[in-house]
């Protein structure tokens, strides 16, 4: 039952999926943390895998960069393959001065400069929010592991290279914790099709201070976030 962008067979995906942007990161997660792994899709090199974590069937697949790419895959995964829980795992740039590099942010809501949710909501402003059950599961997992997390609004940008850096001042004033490029679209798709979605990101760099993590630091922090998220996933 291939779709235009996914060539997996029916039943290839688990109900719960980790959803990083980078397909090679999806491959890394599958090979590092899952058992009994099978690659189930590879259209346009957007790799997807299904395996088990502590006995529970889990899938992981790349979403690509930006809301349009993420929305295409999320739509087909939910609508055509029956995925019910999509957890984006990725990185973001911090805005607020009290958010530090290597912090883990849970996107309770996602502001955006994209018009996609207005298009699906008859021109009105749709509140793109995470699913409470998914969010609570990850928060509880973080508590058990002693992982420091921040919970709040993030911003999903259409442009990586913004022409208006003054917008960062507005974001900070409004309490936005970090900037990424997918969550608002993912949340909109999930609400449209009756699925559950959450965005969990690590701070890889600070837009205000210019501080960045090293490759080694990014990997260590990312691994901690993935384990925390997988531990939450097996409770769903």
From Swiss-Prot:
Phosphate binds at residues 21, 25, 44, 88-91. Its EC number is 2.4.2.1. Pfam families: PNP_UDP_1. It catalyses: a purine D-ribonucleoside + phosphate = a purine nucleobase + alpha-D-ribose 1-phosphate; a purine 2'-deoxy-D-ribonucleoside + phosphate = a purine nucleobase + 2-deoxy-alpha-D-ribose 1-phosphate. Gene3D superfamilies: Nucleoside phosphorylase domain. The record marks 218 as: Important for catalytic activity. One of its GO terms (molecular function) is purine-nucleoside phosphorylase activity. The active site is at 205 (proton donor). This is Purine nucleoside phosphorylase DeoD-type.
């Amino acid at each position: 039952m291939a779709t235009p962008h996914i060539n997996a067979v029916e039943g290839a995906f688990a109900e719960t999926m980790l959803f990083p942007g980078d397909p090679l990161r999806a491959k890394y997660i599958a090979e590092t943390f899952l058992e009994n792994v099978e690659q189930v899709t590879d259209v346009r090199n957007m790799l997807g895998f299904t395996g088990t974590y502590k006995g529970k069937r889990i899938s992981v697949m790349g979403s690509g960069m930006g809301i349009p790419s993420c929305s295409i895959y999320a739509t087909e995964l939910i609508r055509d393959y029956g995925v019910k829980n999509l957890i984006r795992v990725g990185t973001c740039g911090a805005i607020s001065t009290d958010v530090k590099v290597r912090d883990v942010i849970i996107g309770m809501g996602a502001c955006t400069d994209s018009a996609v949710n207005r298009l699906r909501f008859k021109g009105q402003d749709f509140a793109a929010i995470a699913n409470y059950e998914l969010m609570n599961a990850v928060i509880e997992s973080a508590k058990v592991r002693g992982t420091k997390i921040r919970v709040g609004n993030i911003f999903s940008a259409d442009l990586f290279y913004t022409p208006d850096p003054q917008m960062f001042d507005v974001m900070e004033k409004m309490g936005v914790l970090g900037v990424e490029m997918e969550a608002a679209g993912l949340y909109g798709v999930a609400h449209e099709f009756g699925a559950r979605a959450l965005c969990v990101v690590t701070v890889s760099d600070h837009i205000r201070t210019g501080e960045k993590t090293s490759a080694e630091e990014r990997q260590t922090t990312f691994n901690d976030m993935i384990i925390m998220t997988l531990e939450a996933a097996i409770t769903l």
